[in-house]
Amino acid sequence: TLSGALYHQSTFNNLFIEGLSVTAGLRLDYEKISMKYNSLSTPIDFGFDFHMAMGPTQINLSDQNMKAPASFVGKLSTDYVQLLPKFAIQYEWKNQNNVYATVTRGYRSGGYNIQMFSDLSQTELKNSMMNAIKESPTIGQDATWGATIIKMMDQMVPAKEIDVKTSTTYKPEYSWNYEVGSHLTLWEGRLWADVAAFYMDTRDQQLSQFAESGLGRITINAGKSRSYGAEAALRASVTKELSLNASYGYTYATFTDYVITEEKKDSTPIITDYNGKYVPFVPKHTLNIGGEYAITCSPRSIFDRVVFQANYNAAGRIYWTEQNDVSQSFYGTLNWRTNLEIGDAMISFWARNFLNKDYAAFYFETMNKGFMQKGRPMQFGVDLRCRF
């Protein structure tokens, strides 16, 4: 991979009125990706037997000394050039108190699914074996039935054309991102609040899924999607010892143009429409609540400082598939930590998922089966740290 970028950003402060700033930026991105593939192998030895009754005639053909080459050699190269603008406006009426709006264009580079070569090699081997059978003298010398048998083979096991570039390449993902929000400092600088609302239009969205063979994960492009939502966060220094924080996010992400058309063996089209379905792996709600209480010990104490920390992290609902038929409902885990500080050393006692919540951390489907990874159960531990 070869990549490079040119970037410029200008900010105009106190434009028209005190505290108003406008920012404009532009990034020129260039990326060249290339791939060489070489899967040379010794020709496969195989044989075939063909037995069929055609009216009163019994056809018996056999050849057990056949060879089929199975090799894949070539290279691919793709260039991407992108212009990514950025615009922002902010009004700050007091230090650390402002409102803002931004518009940016997002980009995620494309690439190659090298895991697809397992599927492509199998297809190439199948085509090679079928061609070897058709060219076999055993069939070719049968002037009466040879052409009929080859026609039947083409109908029953049609050759599949291989396009390496189309099969392995996934396109870049593009998005337009819009956000408005505010950063506030209140309560004599002891309370910080951040609020934001966002909207995102995404084209050629990249999704991860398993290859048809089940050997390795690949990236696909899933048409268009739309996401919008809001986020809010609070941090408070209640006292010198006690601090609290909380954050919440809501995201509504759905496909707006994602239709897949596949063909059965009889060429009947199968149309799957994902429009309106939720984008997988995007939590609809996220929540975090935490706090810290720090005690400074007296000089006669063994410890210099004792810190108690606790937080509750939650997320859901999370859909695992484009069909939205498997999901994890809203769940949360409680975690805590106690730090005992002695000079440059620290002993920490901690617990994760203290309430032993049962939840799914990941899910995927391959070979028409679903596999779920459960979240870690309740854990306890001790950490020892020393700074030198």
Question: What spans do the regions from the language model cover?
Answer:
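Gram-negative outer-membrane beta-barrel transporters
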Residues: 16, 190-203, 218-321, 385-387
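Outer-membrane beta-barrel strand-turn architecture
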Residues: 12-18, 83, 91-95, 174, ...
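Residues on the lipid-exposed face of transmembrane beta-strands in outer-membrane beta-barrel proteins
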Residues: 6-12, 87-91, 170, 180-184, ...
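Transmembrane beta-barrel architecture of outer-membrane proteins
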Residues: 1-6, 26-36, 79-85, 103-107, ...
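Flexible, surface-exposed loop regions and adjacent strand-edge segments
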Residues: 38-48, 53-55, 116-124, 209-218, ...
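Signature of Gram-negative outer-membrane beta-barrel scaffolds
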Residues: 1-96, 112, 132-134, 158, ...
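C-terminal beta-signal and adjacent terminal beta-strands/loops
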Residues: 107, 241, 312-321, 336-388
